[in-house]
């Protein structure tokens, strides 16, 4: 027995020594990295309040970290020979302090999460009691940038969108290819979507109807994901410009091309943002729940699955309860279009070109989603306008290899810590979201303490310590509270593998330790050692984005020279415009640490004016002449939501995008018959009946359509079909009058603003009322 006990102590001491060294290194590196970011923010600050907060936050952070260091030592189950060296009074006080400090820091967020789970429905269940149709459902445009995606993955993503339990006529997918080449991916995709054109080259933008939903397929010059989203937004803005003047029920959803939407994802998003009882229409942005899926299961994919669920349903739900989420991921984010439109020029600016060093590169490029969320948080006028929708789900493919996972998590870590410090030093966030920022700060102080729990488990396994000798309450709070939530989440979502949360509780600290140490050392090597000889740099011929892409292709996204980005950008702008070599944006010698003050409160929804138009408060001075001019230049209040309403007013505006060509205009009669036959087959396969009579309309050859004015020889807009049909206008008026008198979905009792008026498809209304009369 004595030999076994001695052997257990030897094994325990040897393992514990290594783990303790790891914990100390992690403790020091996190402190050093946080202070380094504070110093960089202090050096780059554009306002004195940033410097003051740097000092206050830095001092408080160091003090709390220093206090937790002796707590870590006395809490560890050290051998008795060592534990006897500590004064009993000091040990008792520190353990008492540790218990209550961690209890508060863990229990308070847990209670916020419980409150959010109770007050908001969790799960993939339909929340709408009424059936949405093309009148009551708000319009949703989905932006899906695509670059070198697997064809079957892309088609699966598109199908998940158009097959959502949402009126197809209210779905408009913008599938944007990041590149103008007509490669196999593009040709295969348009073929799958029913494009039967056999030409040497296709229009840069094509409109098709796929499973009763509208899909706009576009090819843009290669510029990266954010640039692709930018030019797509310009196209959307051009399409719906006039529609937005008379409606504020247009929403834009950003998703990745490998994301699979849940069946009720769109409906639940819209319910929370617009249609829930008592909704005032002030919700501006929401993110959903992104879960991982995989074809090949492993311990890595299992940990990712549990981490995704815990990180979103716990951490983001807590943030949502405190006032706002701090990260709107580009993989699943819905925004109110009229509000986002005011932020677009700040949202889509090329942040990489403003980088001066690796700190800026990590903040604006690696942590782009967090930086942009910071932008929205300042732009919002009040709390709880940027939230988490716990009933909108989508799936994305989990990372399969350890190498790819480490690179991904290094990117996340560097983007997180740089943006976290920027948020903690922005007094506007402390003023608007005090509880949120305080919770974020306190959680940062207790990071990197998870390895201690492994030591406690090891002590029990090696019988060096008894359970009575360990801080059981300490373990019960940290593990027990989280495990209870994961048990509930697993049962609610029927995702029972997340019940293995204790496995993640033990293993994840080691993975997180490696992610952080690897990220800090590689970033530090780049910062103090200088760039490698093959590092990508920007110059007069290479943009910052191209340099970043070159580094990613080489397998190391940190192998760049961000010090060259801003200088190269200024040189190119000076060469392109000799008369104005500087701007207000470039006149500053230091990079921007926080969003500019002029966006404060700018992220807001439009309000209805006396003239029936929608405008922001600072746009309310529209004169009667302007309103009348707008009426004469558009199709009127009852605009057909399926048309490109803004084309007539935007023909002479060069936005650098191509107006979509309606595919029917490019077909001969035989191809058109094949296309409509394919549409009927798609319709049957997707389970959608032809109640609206869409396919019973007579076939119209290209010659049957009137000639359309186009911005260029290659760009033909969709036509204003039926715009002069007075009978249709009368039918629309009857629809709106009847629907507005009832207080159902689509009306708002507080200000009398009716939603979605006249939004039903013109073709569907004509088919219902005069089935024998063609459009």
Swiss-Prot record:
Question: Where would I find glycosylation on this chain?
Answer: 724, 759
- Effect of gene knockout: Does not affect mycelial growth nor sensitivity to various stresses.
Q: What is its EC number?
A: 2.4.1.16
Segments crossing the lipid bilayer: 19-39, 54-74, 94-114, 441-461, 470-490, 498-518
Query: Which keywords describe this protein according to UniProt?
Result: Cell membrane, Glycoprotein, Glycosyltransferase, Membrane, Transferase, Transmembrane, Transmembrane helix, Virulence
| Compositionally biased spans, kind Polar residues | 577-586, 754-763
Which PANTHER family does this one have?
CHITIN SYNTHASE
Q: What is this protein called?
A: Chitin synthase 6
Lineage start: Eukaryota, Fungi, Dikarya, Ascomycota, Pezizomycotina
Q: Which gene encodes it?
A: CHS6
């Amino acid at each position: 027995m004595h030999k076994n006990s001695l052997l257990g102590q030897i094994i325990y001491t040897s393992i514990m020594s290594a783990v303790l060294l790891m914990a100390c290194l992690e403790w020091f590196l996190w402190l050093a990295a946080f202070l380094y970011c504070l110093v960089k923010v202090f050096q780059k600050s554009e306002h004195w309040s940033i410097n003051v907060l740097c000092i206050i936050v830095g001092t408080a952070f160091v003090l709390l970290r220093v206090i937790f260091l002796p707590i870590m030592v006395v809490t560890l189950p050290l051998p008795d020979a060592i534990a006897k060296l500590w004064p009993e009074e000091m040990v008792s006080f520190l353990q008492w302090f540790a218990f209550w400090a961690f209890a508060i820091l863990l229990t308070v967020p847990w209670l916020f999460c419980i409150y959010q789970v109770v007050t908001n429905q969790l799960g993939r269940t339909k929340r709408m009691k009424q059936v949405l149709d093309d009148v009551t459902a708000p319009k949703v445009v989905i932006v899906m940038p695509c670059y070198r995606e697997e064809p079957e993955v892309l088609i699966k993503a598109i199908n998940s969108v158009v097959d959502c339990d949402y009126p197809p006529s209210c779905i408009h997918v913008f599938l944007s290819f990041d590149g103008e080449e007509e490669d196999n991916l593009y040709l295969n995709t348009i073929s799958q979507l029913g494009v039967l054109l056999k030409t040497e080259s296709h229009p840069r933008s094509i409109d098709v109807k796929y499973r009763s939903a509208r899909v706009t397929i576009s090819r843009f010059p290669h510029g990266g994901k954010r640039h692709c989203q930018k030019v797509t937004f310009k196209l959307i803005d051009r399409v719906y410009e006039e529609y937005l003047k008379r409606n504020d029920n247009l929403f834009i959803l950003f998703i990745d091309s490998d994301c699979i939407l849940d069946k009720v994802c769109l409906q639940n998003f819209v319910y929370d943002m617009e249609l829930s009882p008592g909704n005032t229409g002030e919700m501006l942005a929401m993110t959903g729940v992104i879960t991982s899926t995989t074809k090949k299961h492993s311990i890595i994919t299992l940990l990712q699955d549990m981490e995704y669920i815990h990180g979103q349903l716990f951490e983001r739900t807590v943030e949502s309860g405190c006032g706002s989420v701090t990260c709107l991921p580009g993989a699943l984010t819905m925004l109110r279009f009229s509000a986002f439109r005011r932020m677009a020029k700040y949202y889509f600016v090329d942040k990489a070109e403003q980088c001066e060093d690796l700190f800026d590169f990590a903040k604006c490029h690696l942590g782009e989603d967090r930086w942009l969320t910071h932008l929205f948080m300042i732009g919002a006028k009040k709390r709880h306008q940027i939230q988490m929708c716990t009933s909108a789900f989508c799936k994305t493919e989990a990372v399969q290899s350890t190498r790819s996972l480490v690179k991904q998590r290094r990117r996340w870590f560097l983007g997180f810590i740089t943006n976290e410090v920027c948020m903690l030093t922005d007094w506007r966030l402390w003023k608007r979201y005090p509880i949120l920022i305080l919770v974020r700060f306190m959680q940062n102080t207790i990071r990197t303490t998870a390895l201690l729990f492994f030591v406690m488990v090891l002590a029990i396994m090696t019988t060096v310590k008894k359970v009575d000798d360990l801080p059981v309450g300490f373990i019960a709070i940290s593990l027990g509270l989280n495990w209870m939530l994961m048990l509930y989440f697993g049962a609610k979502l029927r995702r029972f593998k997340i019940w293995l949360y204790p496995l993640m509780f033990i293993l994840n600290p080691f993975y997180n330790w490696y992610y952080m140490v690897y990220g800090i050392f590689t970033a530090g090597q780049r910062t103090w050692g200088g760039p490698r000889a093959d590092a990508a740099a920007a110059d007069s011929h290479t943009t910052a984005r191209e340099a970043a892409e070159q580094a990613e292709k080489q397998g190391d996204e940190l192998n760049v020279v961000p010090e060259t980005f801003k200088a190269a950008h200024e040189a190119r702008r000076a060469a392109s415009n000799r008369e104005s070599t500087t701007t207000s944006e470039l006149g500053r010698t230091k990079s921007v640490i926080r969003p500019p003050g002029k966006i404060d409160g700018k992220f807001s929804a439009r309000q209805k004016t006396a003239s029936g138009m929608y405008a922001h408060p600072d746009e309310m001075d529209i004169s009667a002449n302007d309103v009348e001019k707008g009426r004469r230049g558009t199709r009127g209040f009852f605009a057909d939501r399926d048309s490109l309403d803004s084309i007539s007013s935007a023909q002479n505006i060069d936005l650098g995008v191509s107006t979509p060509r309606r595919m029917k205009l490019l077909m001969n009669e035989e191809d058109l018959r094949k296309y409509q036959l394919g549409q009927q087959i798609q319709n049957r396969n997707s389970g959608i009946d032809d109640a609206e009579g869409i396919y019973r309309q007579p076939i119209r050859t290209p010659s049957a359509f009137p000639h359309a004015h186009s911005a260029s020889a290659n760009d033909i807009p969709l036509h204003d079909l039926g715009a002069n049909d007075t009978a249709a206008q009368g039918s629309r008026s009857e629809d709106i009058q009847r629907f507005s008198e009832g207080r159902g979905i689509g009306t708002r009792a507080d200000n009398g603003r009716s939603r979605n008026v006249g939004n039903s498809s013109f073709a569907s209304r004509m088919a219902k009322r005069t089935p024998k009369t063609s459009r």
